[in-house]
Structure formats: C-alpha cells, structure tokens
Amino acid sequence: MTIKVKRVYEHPEAADGTRVLVDRLWPRGLTKDKARVDLWLKEIAPSAELRKWFAHDPAKWTEFKQRYRAELKDKTEQVGELRAVAKKGPVTLLYGAKDEEHNQAVVLLEELRRRL
C-alpha cells in the first residue's frame, strides 16, 4: 500500500492516486474543482475540541499525537474505509494546515502504517 500526505493546496498529480481530505473543515479559498478531492473523510479528523486545543502549536505536538491516536481508536469504521481504499491503489491524505510536520495527516499516516 502506498500512502502519502500532501497539502491540499499543492497541485494535484496523477501519482496522488485517490485524494482523501482528512480535515474536518473544507480548506479556505479552495473550490472543489481545484482541490480535486475524491473522498472527504471529515469524521476521521480530530474532534473540534482537540483541533481547537492544538491550534497547530508545535509545543503541543507530542500530546496532540497521543490524544488524536486515542480518538482514532473509536473511529474504526473510518480507518477501515481508508485502509480499503489504500488496498486498491495509491492514496494521498490531504490536509490544509501550513505546517507540513505537525498536522493530523502525519499522525494518521503513522497510525495506518502501524496497523498494516
């Protein structure tokens, strides 16, 4: 299974495979046509409370990862759907955050690889 992460604002490429948005909110200023999202799994994103608490603060990264992984344990249906898509071909997890290292897609990718 090939799974990677990418900012949704980056240019879509054929190599992206199935493009899955893993944000709870639609990215600002981006039309559906430009985003070229194949699947929007907003339910797999961190809860609104966790997202607001984290606020993309790198100092909270370690605790954010722990809390988000705990939330993912209750999202088996969504994780299963994502794994099923990944078994069919390449998948790109899309996120809107500016920080490429500290975002939920990075944690989700780690978790998917761990569960494979």
Language model region names:
Residues M1-L116:
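Residues lining hydrophobic/aromatic ligand-binding pockets adjacent to catalytic sites
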